[in-house]
Amino acid sequence: MPPSLPSRTEAGTLVAVTLAVVGAWRPWVRKIPVRTADGSLVSTSELVQGLRAGIHGLDMFVVFGALVAVLGTLIARRYDVSPAPFLVAASVLILWAASTMLAEYRSVERYEPELGVYLTLAGGLVLLVLGVARGVKVAVRRRRGERTGPAT
């Protein structure tokens, strides 16, 4: 039997995970140069998490969350269960990592958040919406006595 097409939840999960991982790869912050008394611009030399491109620091939580979402969706498809718990758990990890760093960046005037942190937040929010929507759909169908698997 040929494999079925991915559901909207599966396609949305792929989009969300892509947003989160691409966001984790990109820089999350940049330093704003400070003007000295003589008028020249100087950048501080401290290393800030998220300053460089690549996976390091809290990005590991984003990657782990993305893996939870993908593996949970595959498990849900294979065993005909809802992927909602996996998607919500993944979104919590991703949103925690990105929002923690965004709050830290905004608390210091010399740092400006970059596109990466916003892409990661968007991916986490999409996963959260997908997980909650799927959970509500399953709850409504159970209440009505209908089939609740992800194929519906």
Language-model region placement:
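Compact integral membrane and secretory-pathway proteins
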Residues: M1-T152
